[in-house]
Regions:
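N-terminal targeting sequences that direct proteins away from the cytosol to non-cytosolic compartments
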Residues: 2, 6-7, 11-58, 85-93, ...
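A short acidic-to-branched-hydrophobic micro-motif
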Residues: 50-75, 127, 187-210, 268
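Generic alpha-helical hydrophobic packing signal
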Residues: 64-67, 98, 200-202, 234-236, ...
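Residue-level signal for short segments within beta-strands and strand-turn junctions
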Residues: 64-66, 151, 200-202, 243, ...
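Residues that form generic nucleotide/phosphate-binding pockets
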Residues: 73-79, 146, 213-218, 289
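A short, amphipathic edge element
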Residues: 77-87, 216-228
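Short, Gly/Ser/Thr-enriched beta-strand-loop segments that form substrate-interacting elements
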Residues: 95-110, 235-252
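Extracellular C-type lectin-like domains
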Residues: 112-114, 254-257
Length: 293
């Protein structure tokens, strides 16, 4: 996870000046049993959405792109190819109607949904095993009926955050880590001077299962302990250290760690633009505004 963190901070450094349509992002909701991933990433200045979720023998794979990203939403008729598609009745996803097609390929039966809404387009693919697919028809229809595009993610658990005005959201993803929905959000200042990642994980899962593991993962052995900070009335450890990024460069960094009974939290701040008075002031603003909400 520390290697992933270094790579993420290096990415934030590159994307510091990127701009994307943070407003209007839509999340796919539905009656799922488990969620592998669900969220947005900023790629080449545009947001991309991905969701992988399951219910019994049914698997859903969804991707979404901003309309101006350069990608195109093609219906099966437009895409061509050798597969035979059956046109199905449109599905209502709340924010828009989705065209629907059915086909078989690679040992699975697929329902393909295509939808455009609020400046984004989404491709949603629902797969069941081809053998015995008919016995799952009712479950597939029930799952499709439960799908909706909403302005907020399916997440009722408090998340760590701060005053990120003037920052660009680079990533916001959820994933079922075995004990509940974990979440990662990452932000970069417009000038690339400061970046921050916020992480939440179930307290029963490594490295969120103890304060020691949080320190090992997010601060490291050579970190300097600073005065604790308070987050929503709870005391949290603060550490200062140097991260060696994926490209080999060094980055002054700080971590704030908040263990909990159900969920634990970590915030990692990178002075990706160096230790300047402006970046130090921005870091203090972030630290002073840390809160669970």
């Amino acid at each position: 996870m520390r290697r992933l963190l270094c790579a993420l901070l290096a990415l934030l450094l590159l994307l510091g000046g990127a701009a994307g349509a943070e407003e209007g992002r839509l999340w796919l909701h539905g009656d799922f049993e488990s969620v592998e991933t669900d969220g947005y990433r900023l790629q080449n200045g545009f947001y991309e959405y991905e969701k992988i979720a399951h219910k019994g023998d049914i698997s859903l794979y969804a991707v979404g792109y901003e309309a101006e990203s350069g990608y195109a939403l093609l219906t099966p008729e437009e895409a061509g190819g050798d597969l035979t598609y059956e046109r199905m009745e449109d599905a209502n996803l709340g924010a828009a109607q989705a065209g629907r097609w059915r086909y078989t390929d690679a040992g699975s039966r697929w329902d393909f949904l295509a939808v455009e809404a609020e400046g984004f387009f989404f491709s949603i693919m629902i797969a069941v095993p081809e053998t015995g697919a008919e016995r799952l028809d009712e479950e597939v229809e029930a799952l499709i009926s439960s799908l909706s595009l909403e302005a907020e993610p399916t997440d009722d658990t408090p998340m760590l955050g701060a005053d990120t005005s003037g920052f660009t959201l680079v990533m916001d993803t959820l994933a079922d880590d075995g004990g509940g929905l974990g979440r990662v959000t990452a932000w970069a200042a417009a000038d690339g001077g400061v970046s921050v990642t916020f992480q939440r994980g179930a307290a029963g899962e490594y490295p969120f299962d103890s304060a020691e593991h949080l320190r090992e993962t997010f601060a490291g052995e050579d970190a300097e302990r600073l005065e604790d900070v308070y987050i929503s009335g709870q005391s949290a450890e603060r550490w200062r250290f140097t991260l060696v990024l994926a490209d080999g460069s060094e980055c002054p960094a700080e971590a704030v760690l908040l263990p909990g009974e159900e969920f634990s939290y970590a915030a990692v701040f990178g002075l990706t633009g160096g230790e300047t008075p402006e970046n130090a002031a921005m870091l203090e603003r972030l630290l002073d505004s840390l809160a669970l909400s």
